[in-house]
Amino acid sequence: MSKKLIGLAGKAGAGKDTVADYLWEKEGAIKIAFADALRAAGASIFGLDPRNFLDRDLKEAEVEYWGMTPRRMLQLLGTEATKSVFGDDIWLKRWFLSYSAVQDTDHVVVPDVRFDVEAEAIRHLGGTIIHIVRPGVGLDGDSATHVSEAGIEFRFGDMHLSNSGSVEELHHKVDRLWETIK
């Protein structure tokens, strides 16, 4: 069995984490997000429980003290506050440290490909990008217009996954895609 590196792209609520969790359960894929280190930094800086940056409901609820949602905190910390100083690839470089440390595993899934530079790195490492599309999902307000929500370009070799049914239907589609990925 060959090692697989899968990057998942799509709007908020499209099913990226659902697919990543399923690949962990079914195939033993290790989940390494580009935002793992960012979430840890955000929890420390803003004094919040890390779950505020993971739980869908919590990350959309405004934190009165800061006057914004945890999602917005990470958007601003992850781009405006760091990329101008450390470069556009700061989170990619940090992700690569984590990815390199677990190369003894067979499969790795990245549930949060938000920028073309991230997708290119995964492709360069021999990985596959899966674009997950689910009708009627996405963000509202300031979070929706942030550059991290713009999506990435579909390239030759990328795959498309439509998530318009039940979780069981999604799992079945993932199983079929998994078999075609080399």
Where on the chain are the PLM-derived regions?
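ATP-dependent small-molecule kinase phosphotransfer cores
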Residues: 36-106
